[in-house]
A protein has these predicted regions:
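N-terminal binding-site loop/beta-alpha segment at the start of enzyme catalytic domains
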Residues: 15-31
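Alpha/beta enzyme core
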Residues: 27-65, 78-99, 103-190
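N-terminal amphipathic alpha-helix/helix-capping segment at the start of soluble metabolic enzymes
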Residues: 1-18, 83-91
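Short glycine/proline- and acidic residue-enriched helix-loop micro-motifs
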Residues: 67-74
């Protein structure tokens, strides 16, 4: 049989088939089946901070503002704990790299989520930056700079490879990709 071994983002893969973040990768059981079917690596379904915030917002009680803060913290911790457990369980049942994927809205969450995912055993991190800008005052080029800033902050706190996932709303993707690699990205994906 042909040897399909390759390297991606510094990770050794038995083949170049990487299962992307989706509903197919949201449980350790599914991930085990994907690994057994021959996947070279798995990107877990993304954890979206925005979804956590929306869920907390939907449960707000306007008559008890203090309780809303506790509720938001509880939901955040619960969702993050579930995701960290997904990493740990997937690592137990898979013999291939497990890549955590995060999409955060606030700068502090990127760093906190990244550290905890590395500690949970993720082999690499995919940073999914997707934000639709509707503010007319938003400075041209700020979105691209945000990618570089987030990467730089995360690289300071984790040792595992950081993969940057780009959306389709960039003014100059080639220049941004060059800057991401120059600032330590292990890989860039679309």
């Amino acid at each position: 049989m042909t040897d399909l071994k390759t390297t991606f983002a510094g990770l050794q893969l038995k083949n170049p088939i990487i299962i992307s973040s989706s509903g197919l990768t949201n449980s350790a059981g599914k991930n085990k089946k994907l690994a057994e079917a021959g996947a070279g690596a798995i990107v877990l379904k993304s954890l979206f901070e925005e979804q956590i915030l929306i869920e907390a917002d939907q449960l707000k009680d306007p008559t008890y503002s203090e309780g809303n803060d506790y509720l938001a913290d509880y939901i955040r911790e619960h969702k993050l704990a579930e995701y960290l457990e997904l990493i740990k369980e997937s690592k137990k049942v898979c013999d291939i790299p497990i890549i955590a994927s995060i999409n955060c809205y606030t700068d502090t969450e990127w760093i906190d989520f990244a550290k905890q995912m590395e500690e949970a055993g993720a082999d690499a991190l995919e940073i999914n930056i997707l934000a639709v800008q509707s503010d007319i005052q938003y400075k041209y080029g700020s979105f691209e700079q945000r990618h570089i800033d987030i990467l730089s902050h995360i690289k300071k706190v984790v040792k595992i490879p950081v993969i940057m996932k780009l959306g389709d709303n960039l003014t100059n993707p080639v220049a941004l990709i060059d800057q991401l690699y120059a600032n330590g990205a292990a890989a860039v994906v679309l």
